[in-house]
Amino acid sequence: MAPGAFSLHQATSSDQEITYIINYGEGQTEPLRTKILNTYTMVFNDGSAPGAVDTSWLGTLGLTGWVGPEARGAVSGAGITGRDPRFAYTVGFSNATAQYWAAADTTDGHFTSAGMIPGTYTMKVYKNELAVDTRTVTVNAGASTSAGTIAVTGDPGAATALWRIGDWDGSPAEFINGGKVTTMHPSDVRMASWTPGDYVVGTSTPATGFPAYQWKDVNGALTVRFNLRQSQIVPLRLRVGITTAFAGGRPKAQVNGWVSANPSPSTQPSSRTLTVGTYRGNNTMYTFDIPATELVVGQNVLTLTAISGSSGIRFLSPGYSYDALDLIPTP
């Protein structure tokens, strides 16, 4: 349960209630899928892991929309190449009426997604929580579709960077407070300071030097200092990845005297996210092309400023969650 959802905590002196919420609406990135019949089982026992529960009797009730096992299909992949061994990979399937997930094997990336309703799906390979490959696949009743071996070509982390802060994986976990944001409110006294001071490339570390979240009214300007050699004074591209944003928050970049244009806001959930325990939204990468004439040999100063046409106070001001940022030669 997300922090702040106190209205969901209900109890009296004589009874306790369990509320199982399937569709909550916080951080919702896709239209609500309706008319989906799924089986959910709540088991009360001594605390040990329950065994398989037979729910096949649901198929005898004549429920509208029920699709039995024999009318479903599967997708299997022989493997996934181009993976980063530091991360787990997941394969997701989605269309307007259904959604499925399958874990990729840690050794070679093979996977199987069974019990799928027939149809055409968008299939995405996720590096942790960042989509790094997208394609379509068709599922047929009573059959298994082969996706072959998938070669990942869309991982931004595969690019050689002059420097990189964080990991391109769709999560802020490696940054300051990144491991706490799903269980604590940003104002919690157990949180480290959201304003850590300048980040110095080559000296600072993401875990202690760069915040997971940035808000317009909390830590509205973050500074990164980095050195360049003469051979590195070429057109460079700054890439800034965010995982979600609130109230149109997005980063604007300044490098030395060069100031970027205001980027457009990303498409994100309309609800609160950063203050209700989720960093998950629509992963978005902002790119800023820096002219070589604006760079200097020695120390350069990058300032990231949280901007938005909206306003708010403190943690309810426009903001966003970081995925990673890096500097690469302009392609």
Q: Where are each of the predicted segments found?
A:
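Short, acidic Ser/Thr/Gly-rich low-complexity loop/linker segments typical of extracellular
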Residues: 95-110
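A short, solvent-exposed beta-strand micro-motif common in secreted/extracellular proteins
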Residues: 109, 119-129, 306
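Short, ordered, surface-exposed loop/turn motifs in non-cytosolic proteins
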Residues: 73-75, 81-99, 118-119
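Compositionally biased low-complexity segments at domain edges in trafficked proteins
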Residues: 149-203
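Structured interaction patches on ligand/partner-binding surfaces of diverse proteins
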Residues: 129-148, 152-155
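Beta-strand-rich recognition/accessory modules
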Residues: 1-68
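A short, amphipathic beta-strand motif
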Residues: 73-83, 109-111, 148-150
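Beta-strand-rich ligand-recognition modules
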Residues: 219, 227-233, 241-330
